[in-house]
Amino acid sequence: PVGPLGAAPGSGGAGLPRPFRGAEPAWPYPGPLTYANHRPVEALYAYGLAFRRQEAVALARRALAFLKEHYFTPGEEGLFFDPVGNRFMARGRDKPLFDQQPIEAKCALLAHLRFGERVLAEVAFLWFHGRNRLRAPLVDAFGPMDGLTPHGPNQNRGAEALLAYLLAWQALVQGVFPQVDEGVALGRVFALGGRP
């Protein structure tokens, strides 16, 4: 069986590029923008590096550029992270602004670190600390809150918010694992007998 993003279990990710390849240039993401949209893009990029697939790396870069357009907004203090809200976004539809979820900041941060874009990763992390649409901190002495509603922070403090915050913070401090330089990875795989 094939998963929703085209990769069959145990395939080593060989099917990952297919839905991205079939996506239209104006909407290079396979499907609507829902939750954790940066994760498949990061997976495609990691697959491209690990198996020396230039097409996968290029498709991942194209999809990440598309996500940047929809997830980062210029503001008075510079760029801020502004994820798609929980009503999701289909092509040709307006972006739902709320309820923004912590998982989005964490996933964007990890992807941008993986792509070597630390500044954007830091901007995504600052979403938790008030660099967001409402300039409302989502973390205080009691921990992170569950999201950003039109009226301010969702005061619930669930495990997802806590884990998203801690994993994002850890990645900023320690970096993503494994740390792979794109040029070195592509050359190393080739040297080990990978296909050009």
Segment roles from a protein language model:
Residues 1-196:
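Glycan-recognition and catalytic cores of secretory/periplasmic carbohydrate-active enzymes
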